[in-house]
Amino acid sequence: GLRQVVDKYLVQDRSGGGVYESPQFMYIMIALTIFAEYPKEVRMNYVKKYYDAVSKHKINIPTPIMGGVRTPIRQFASCVLVDIDDTLDSIFSSDMAIGRYVAQRAGIGINAGRIRGINSKIRGGEVQHTGVVPFLKKFEATVRCCTQNGIRGGSATVHFPIWHQEIRDIIVLKNNKGTEDNRVRKLDYSIQLSALFYQRFIDNEKITLFSPHDVPNLFDSFGSPEFDELYRTYEADESIPKTTIGAQELILELLKERAETGRIY
């Protein structure tokens, strides 16, 4: 345990091997940094309480805080959610944000469910969309290019709704089948479901898949009372492109990939 603390968390010269602090210095510096802006009359009381709690292992703190909060990086967030819109400006600026936060030791959540599906129209059909996989490969490369100052490799979980047009391709991205062209194995994935889809699974009904840009506000209404009504409205609208799949078929595919890879949430 002590060796792990020294190797992963203590401030040091990772090229030359010099270690500049002990574990107790690490704990007190974390406490001093976190409460540095508190009023003087209460600050040291909080510092002492926090130092006692972490140094006696009564509470645990995440790697980004333990490794970086007392350094010039000042990374206070252990995890960061990057919310991506369906535009190139948003996608590319989000990729830059992912890189910066990975370099600052944060774990990354990528909310990519607004990105439209493959072959969707862009500018009225002037261009066809390449789909989510090429952008996921870009995010994967960004996450893996930083090692979080030698403490650990970057990591990210990408979130998609189960009704996304490309969901069947998304849930297999981590498995060992396929080729490098159609797999993005270094990212993890989270699939968003609700009671509506679970009930359709129980009743052996269909799930309708959409490209997010064809169904305005559907993604943003997830988790609200309006979602179910809006989803059914779009299902009934014959002018909206859509495909259907058996709920049991899709969810069992998801569970199969989860069992085999262990990294679909």
Identify the function of each model-found stretch.
Residues 1-265:
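Extended catalytic cores of very large enzyme megasubunits
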